[in-house]
Amino acid sequence: MFKNEYQGGAFVEIFSAQGKNPGAKWKILGSPSVIWKEFDKEVKSFVFVLEGSSQTNRIQLPKENKQILGLIQRFLVLQIYIPLGQDFSTELLITDLGNIKRRLYLSTVHKEVSSTPLHAKIPLFMIQRKIWCNLCIDLVAFTSEIFKGAVFQSLDGIIVSANCKLRKIFTLKSKPQETADKDDEPTDIIPRSCQLATDVPHVTQLLNMTKLRQTEIKFGGHPLRSAESEQFISSGAGSVQNSKGQDVCHIAFGSRVLGPPPLSGRRNNLRQSTETVRSIRYKNSQLCQQPTEERSVNSTEVSALLADQQGEKGSARPLKQTTPLPAKLPIPYPHPPQEPSADKGSNRRRLRLKSSSGDRTEAHCGCSSGNNRSEEDVVMALNSIPQLRTEPVRASTPEPPAPEQPDEWIFPESGGLTSDPAWSSPPLLLDEDSHTASNLWLETSKDSEHDQAEETQRAPKDIFTFSSRPRSAPHGKSHDMSPKGCPFTLDTQDDSQVTKEDPKLEGGFYGSESSEEEYNWRNYQPSQMSESELQMLASLRRQQNEDLEDTGAPHGLSASQVDHCNVSISTSSDDTTTWNSCLPPPVNQGRHYQKEMNPPSPSNPRDWLNMLSPPIVPPSQQPVEQSLDSSASLSVQGEEDPRVEEDEEVLTLLYDPCLNCYFDPQTGKYYELV
């Protein structure tokens, strides 16, 4: 627009609010209610008023993006009035001698100078408000100091956003005389045609990198250094900060920055955390392969290793003291989540085993056939896992060979998750190698039953639990059976054998006591039970008596499986495989399992309502699990089992005594008893 016009004079006027239609050449973005021309009595002339949001209400020159202004003079002056408490911003499109177009964003919103190879954000917090101001922008200085090696050629676009009053926009060939200016550089006065009236209070402010540095010092920050290093431009993300909580050298515009760049700091922290997790996993897997005497590792060593690695990367932070890590137990322990888990996207559905004390255990369930004594030992081993002492496990205890464990001691990558008592237990995991692991666990439990029983009685203070909910697989998809994510994963072939061969093992899980500290269910029992729930419990008891008398084991299930069908529905998995041998009991049943199965002879429901009733699902939403047997499925309230359908979801219902209904944590729905 101005490329072919003479620009050798003292100034070139770009915009003036005077005249019939001053915005004819401008593209106005905003309704007339927020952008209009009015006569200002203070300056005794017309002004353009822009109000509202600075992101939507603005004026742009030139109208078409294909056009360019071609303004070559060094200084751009905006004659504006910015009200108190309002944001203001302007955007300048400049072209350097290499014909590369770059943008300068000047805004009162920005608190620091930051730049990429093509964009720069410049703060305007030093601008004076509630007074008319000749804001003079040094285009040559910003171009050369922000974009390293660039030389200003022309100003090709201007965008002025709300909120402000705009009187004139023009360019100057020489630096204007600034208010309270003490520089010795040659200055010039603003041309008479562009000056405000002498009786109008106004100031002239020059904006360049030197002024920004001086303002930074005035506002209590550290001085900004001149552009000396190529690291600022080569990285494309250099910035100038107030250096709050950082060293002085972090606040360097173009100078050397010792720490990570601020804009990509979070990305670097995530990358460093990932590298630390991988290193910890690798070293722990090596520890598991060492001799027995060297396999007991304290958590302080692991914490020190993590702190050292983070300290080398410049991002060390305090670590919480956790329980010891016995490397000889092939079981990942609960840990305080600091960041979302790295395997967030996996489709594995984890089974949960709840104990009567409210703790969750993460265990390896074996599925080999053995005598009842061995199976009870397995239960003792499983239940004593979260009750580890704060000293290393004795090396003399026999242990199974530890497999490769990619999941041992995972340190999550992001903070902000709070622990929820309702979801305070780790998942129960099963592996393809569960046959072998079970036999090894049986042998181990025989020799170390007394040691583990003593450990069970000592509850450590620093037991950490998971705070994230277990996730289910998407509809229509089976779970991820690969062993890469967890030490044990469910195998479909093992599952069918579990269902058919191990009724004793199932009973062992329910009959054992998982903790010395009993869960006080009386604190969470509703004072009154509804009639529908009483009827349901009565029918449940009748069905239990009939099933106990029936020696034929109806529905094609073993006797222990029928017991499980009558006591609890699957509260864990929506997998297409059937997993009946390790179904967890309802949250408050624990050691009262036998008491519920054999109620007293008087048929008074209030005599045996001391425990929480099992989860009840409406018949229309009866949970169905696919079984490799022809007819193995669950039964609720004496109704016939629906036919097994593939990929049908199993509901996980939790009883809410306050609302007297059942809650599905996955869908957020509540179910009432009918």
Curated annotation (Swiss-Prot):
Origin: domain of life: Eukaryota
Biased composition (Basic and acidic residues): 444-461
Spans annotated as Disordered: 255-425, 444-522, 571-646
InterPro entries membership: CFA20/CFAP20DC, CFA20_dom
Pro residues bias: start-end ranges: 327-339
Biased composition (Polar residues): 266-302
Protein name per Swiss-Prot or TrEMBL: Protein CFAP20DC
Native organism: Mus musculus
Gene: Cfap20dc
